[in-house]
Amino acid sequence: MSELYSTPQPFYYDKKSGFTQDEFKHAIDKSSTIYVGYLSFYTTEEQLYELFSKCGEIKRIIMGLDRNQKTPCGFCFVEYYSKEDAADCIKYINGSKLDERLIRCDWDYGFKEGRQYGRGLSGGQVRDEYRTDYDPGRGGYGKQRQFEMDQFSDVNGGDITYQQQILQLQQSQQQHQLYQQANAGGPQNYSGKRNRGADDDSDSFKRQRDNNGSISAGNTPNKGRFRERDEEDD
């Protein structure tokens, strides 16, 4: 039972580590590295040293960086010299508050070059790609949400609320549907098919023309059926 409490229990399995789950567990058992998440983008390395050194001597801290901007993006790795100090870090610092944020500390299998960069499409962390809430400590809205808002802002020439964006999107979709419905029967007018109403009008016109003395094929013109005064036929 004592081994259950002394063996590190990571909260996640990093599928991109290249390890099997057994290999990952073995690496965790030997590691004295801590992953720290939910940090503010504005938390400094000096602040991290001040906090995490309370649990033991620190070998180094590796700040997590935006892959493109090379600026802090909300996580770091803390390497201790001893595994006991790393265990104390998880025991006492995990869930504590730093820069008005509850931070998360978890066992890590060990830092490798390249892991300091965010894995998100825009360069930061994946969690900040799809986040829909506004978090001033992590750059405002999530990247995807901010991209959508910027598109609406550019189209409309200024800042608009998210609710207005959704309303405009719905209106645009409705207008597109109405346009498609209005033009659904349009091609028939140009396909060579005659409109029945147009045929009726044409027949009526022909009868009126014949009745008023139009020229029939092979015949001489006829006088109009209705006369305004008595006249002799030629």
Curated annotation (Swiss-Prot):
Keyword tags: mRNA processing, mRNA splicing, Nucleus, RNA-binding, RNA-mediated gene silencing
Record region (Disordered): 122-144, 177-234
Domain RRM: 32-110
Pfam families with a match to the protein in the record: RRM_1 (PF00076)
Listed Polar residues bias regions: 182-192, 211-222
Superkingdom, natural source: Eukaryota
GO annotation, biological process: mRNA cis splicing, via spliceosome; mRNA splicing, via spliceosome; regulatory ncRNA-mediated gene silencing
Principal cellular location given in the protein's record: nucleus
InterPro entries reported for this sequence: NCBP2, NCBP2_RRM, Nucleotide-bd_a/b_plait_sf, RBD_domain_sf, RRM_dom
Localization: Nucleus
Entry's family note: Belongs to the RRM NCBP2 family.
UniProt-recorded name of the protein: Nuclear cap-binding protein subunit 2
Native source organism of the sequence: Dictyostelium discoideum (Social amoeba)
Lineage: Eukaryota, Amoebozoa, Evosea, Eumycetozoa, Dictyostelia
